[in-house]
C-alpha cells in the first residue's frame, strides 16, 4: 500500500500515530482560518463577477462525485434557459498559456482530466486557471453567460461567490474530522456551518443537514470505437479488470460489484498518468475504467477497454431548492 493510501486509511479508520501530526495541524488551521478571516473582513482584492457564481466543492481530500454533479447542474440550468460556463483550476494540466479555454479535441495533459471530461460530455464553455478570478473574467470576455459554476475553489476566496455547495461522501463522511495533515479536512469542520447546502454522495435519503444524491451507471462505452452498450452488457459474474485513478477508487469498485461483476481492482493515484504498459494485466480480461480515466487512455486503448458512464441523480428536495436559488439569483 502506497504512503498516500496508508494516510487516507488512517484518516478514515483511525491510527494512534496521527497524534504526532497535531502540532502541524494547528499551524495549518491558523493559516486557513486567517485566510478566511481576511476574506470576511474584506481585505485584499476580491473579484465579483457581473453574473452569479456558484462554487461546487468539498472540504475533504478525496473524491466526492463533484464532476457528475456539475454535469447535472449544467444540463439542469440549460433546461431553464440559462447560459452556463465553468471555471476550474485544471489540476495537472499543462496548457500553453493561462487562462486556457478547454476544447473537446485537446489532450488531458493539456486541459486536465476533469475539465476535459466536462467539455466532452456537455460542450460547456470552460476555462482553466489556478487563478479562478482571472478564469472567470476571461470566460465572460469570450462568451455571453448568465451563470458561472466553479469546479472546486471553495477555498479560493479571491473569487466572490453567490452560492456554496459542499459535497461529502456519505460512506466515509469527514473521517476523523481533523485538518491536514492529521486528518482529511482542508478547512475546519465549522466551515460547513457557513455554506448554503451540503450534498451527500451515496445517501439514500435526505438528511437533517443536507441533501442526498446518487451516482447512477448509465452506459458502458468502448474507448476505441465509441460503441455504447447498456450496463448489463456483461453477464452477471463476469470477471474484469477495473481501473480507477480517482479520489476514492473503492467507490468505483463497489459500483462494479453492485452490477454483479467480479472486478480485479487496480487503484491508481488521483489524476494518474497512464500508459498501455501500465494497464496491461494478466489474465486477459475485459477492462472497465472510470470516465475520468478514459479521457487519458483513448489514444492507446485496446479493443476490449470500456468506461462506465455515470450520471448524478439528486433528490427531489435538492432539485426544488436549487430551482429556488436559480430564481433568486436570476436578474
From Swiss-Prot:
Domain of life (superkingdom): Bacteria
Keyword terms, alphabetized: ATP-binding, Kinase, Lipid A biosynthesis, Lipid biosynthesis, Lipid metabolism, Nucleotide-binding, Transferase
Pathway named in the protein's UniProt entry: Glycolipid biosynthesis; lipid IV(A) biosynthesis; lipid IV(A) from (3R)-3-hydroxytetradecanoyl-[acyl-carrier-protein] and UDP-N-acetyl-alpha-D-glucosamine: step 6/6
Record-listed ATP binding positions: 60-67
Protein EC: 2.7.1.130
Pfam families for this protein: LpxK
Record bears the keyword Lipoprotein: no
InterPro entries cross-referenced by the UniProt entry: LpxK, P-loop_NTPase
Catalysed conversion reaction: a lipid A disaccharide + ATP = a lipid IVA + ADP + H(+)
Uppermost EC category: transferase
GO BP term, pick one: lipopolysaccharide core region biosynthetic process
Any one GO molecular function term: ATP binding
Cellular component, GO annotation: plasma membrane
Keyword Cell division: no
Cited function: Transfers the gamma-phosphate of ATP to the 4'-position of a tetraacyldisaccharide 1-phosphate intermediate (termed DS-1-P) to form tetraacyldisaccharide 1,4'-bis-phosphate (lipid IVA).
Family indicated by similarity: Belongs to the LpxK family.
Name of protein: Tetraacyldisaccharide 4'-kinase
Source species: Pseudomonas savastanoi pv. phaseolicola (strain 1448A / Race 6)
Gene from which this protein is expressed: lpxK
Amino acid at each position: 500500500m502506497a504512503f498516500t493510501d496508508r494516510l487516507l486509511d488512517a484518516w478514515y479508520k483511525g491510527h494512534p500515530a496521527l497524534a504526532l501530526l497535531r502540532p502541524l495541524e494547528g499551524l495549518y488551521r491558523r493559516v486557513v482560518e486567517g485566510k478566511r478571516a481576511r476574506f470576511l473582513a474584506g481585505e485584499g482584492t476580491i473579484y465579483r463577477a457581473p453574473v452569479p457564481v456558484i462554487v461546487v466543492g468539498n472540504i475533504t481530500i478525496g473524491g466526492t462525485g463533484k464532476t457528475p454533479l456539475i454535469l447535472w447542474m449544467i444540463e439542469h440550468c440549460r433546461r431553464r434557459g440559462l447560459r452556463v460556463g465553468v471555471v476550474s483550476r485544471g489540476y495537472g494540466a499543462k496548457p500553453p498559456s493561462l487562462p486556457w479555454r478547454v476544447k473537446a479535441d485537446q489532450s488531458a495533459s493539456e486541459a486536465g482530466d476533469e475539465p476535459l471530461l466536462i467539455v466532452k460530455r456537455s460542450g460547456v464553455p470552460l476555462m482553466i486557471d489556478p487563478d479562478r478570478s482571472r478564469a472567470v473574467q476571461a470566460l465572460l470576455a469570450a462568451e455571453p453567460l448568465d451563470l458561472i459554476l466553479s469546479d472546486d475553489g471553495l477555498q479560493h476566496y479571491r473569487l466572490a461567490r453567490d452560492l456554496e455547495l459542499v459535497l461529502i461522501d456519505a460512506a466515509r463522511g469527514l473521517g476523523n474530522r481533523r485538518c491536514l495533515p492529521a486528518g482529511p479536512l482542508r478547512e475546519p469542520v465549522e466551515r460547513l456551518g457557513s455554506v448554503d447546502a451540503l450534498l451527500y454522495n451515496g445517501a439514500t435519503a435526505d438528511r437533517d443537514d443536507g441533501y442526498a444524491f446518487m451516482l447512477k451507471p448509465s452506459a458502458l462505452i468502448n474507448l476505441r470505437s465509441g460503441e455504447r452498450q447498456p450496463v448489463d452488457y456483461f453477464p452477471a459474474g463476469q470477471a474484469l479488470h477495473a481501473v480507477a485513478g480517482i479520489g476514492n477508487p473503492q467507490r468505483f469498485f463497489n459500483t462494479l460489484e453492485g452490477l454483479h461483476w467480479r472486478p480485479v481492482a487496480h487503484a491508481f493515484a488521483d489524476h494518474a498518468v497512464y500508459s498501455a504498459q501500465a494497464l496491461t494485466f494478466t489474465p486477459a480480461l475485459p477492462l472497465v475504467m472510470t470516465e475520468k480515466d478514459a479521457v487519458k487512455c483513448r489514444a492507446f486503448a485496446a479493443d476490449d477497454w470500456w468506461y462506465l458512464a455515470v450520471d448524478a441523480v439528486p433528490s427531489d428536495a435538492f432539485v426544488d431548492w436549487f430551482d429556488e436559488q436559480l430564481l433568486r439569483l436570476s436578474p
